């Protein structure tokens, strides 16, 4: 039997980049990673063998520790909390995916231009949480499924928004997004 591996098999470039940043940082000693870099236990176990310690919350990270932020992006409050632990500048390696950063920049520009921004994503996913922060609203409307399109329309009509933009968490389905906006 012949097995062919897809040309684009493996991690997306944002996750690959985050793993590379964590591994490179850990060459200089103990490194904390805030959150999961990747949803793959084998890879996490391999990284733990390389001076990398994963922290699910900031309280687990000691003051003055070298820290890497995951690819999903973080709300500004994360940076503020880390700064309070003297974790900034050369002690902080931000591995946010460039595509996620691009979404954050687009969202800021849309909000500054008077748009109500709706997120197509998972409410509890770090990327949607971080994007929501950049919209500057705890009441950011997040729709998780294209089947919830009626709730989006209801939200728009109820609030009488003049300009609306719907953006997507980068890991959501393109087909789902198209279904939602149509």
Language model features: what each stretch is:
Residues 1-182:
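The feature marks the mature, well-folded catalytic cores of soluble enzymes
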């Amino acid at each position: 039997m012949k097995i062919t591996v897809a040309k684009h098999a493996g991690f997306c470039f944002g996750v690959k980049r985050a793993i590379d940043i964590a591994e490179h940082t850990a060459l200089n000693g103990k490194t904390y990673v805030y959150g999961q870099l990747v949803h793959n236990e084998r890879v996490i176990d391999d990284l733990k063998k390389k001076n990398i310690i994963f922290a699910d919350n900031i309280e687990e990270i000691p003051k003055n520790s070298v820290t890497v932020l995951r690819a999903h992006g973080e709300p500004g409050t994360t940076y503020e909390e880390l700064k309070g632990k003297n974790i900034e500048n050369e002690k902080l390696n931000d591995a946010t995916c460039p595509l996620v950063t691009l979404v954050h920049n687009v969202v800021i520009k849309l909000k500054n231009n008077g748009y109500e921004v709706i997120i197509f994503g998972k409410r509890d996913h770090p990327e949607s949480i971080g994007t929501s922060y950049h919209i500057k609203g705890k009441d950011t409307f997040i729709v998780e499924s294209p089947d919830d399109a009626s709730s989006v329309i209801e939200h728009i009509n109820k609030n009488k928004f003049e300009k609306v933009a719907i953006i997507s968490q980068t890991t959501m389905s393109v087909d789902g997004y198209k279904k939602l906006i149509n």
